[in-house]
Amino acid sequence: IMISTEYYRYFVEKHVCDEPFIRMAKAMGVQDAQRAEDFVTALVQLQEACGVAELKMSDYGIAREGADTLAANARETMGGLFTADPCELNHEDCRMIYEKSYR
C-alpha cells in the first residue's frame, strides 16, 4: 500500500499500458476516465476511503536510506513477480519508487 501510488505512477509515466489503466479507472468509478493517470487518482481516492492513505514507512521504522536495501531485497526475494510487470523494473527503478514513496 505504501508504495502502490508511486509503483503505478511509474508505469503510467512510461505509457506502457495506458488502456488497461483507463479500464481500471472506469472500473473504480471514474466514468469519464480517458487518461492512465485517472487510475492513479482513483487509487489515491480508494486509499483515502479505506483509511490507509496516511500509512508511512517511517512509522514502521523504515529509514529513507534503506531504499537501496529494500530494492535489492524485493528483487532477490520476489524476482519472479517482476516478470509480470508491464515493462522491466531494474534495481534503480525500484530504489526510486521506494524513495518517492517514503514519508
Residue spans of the language-model regions?
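C-terminal charged capping/lid subdomain of soluble metabolic enzymes
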Residues: 18, 23-103
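Conserved phosphate/anionic-ligand binding catalytic regions in large, soluble enzymes, centered on
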Residues: 1-3
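Glycine- and Gly-Pro-enriched alpha-helical subdomains that act as flexible
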Residues: 9-13
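Conserved protein kinase catalytic domain
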Residues: 5-8, 25
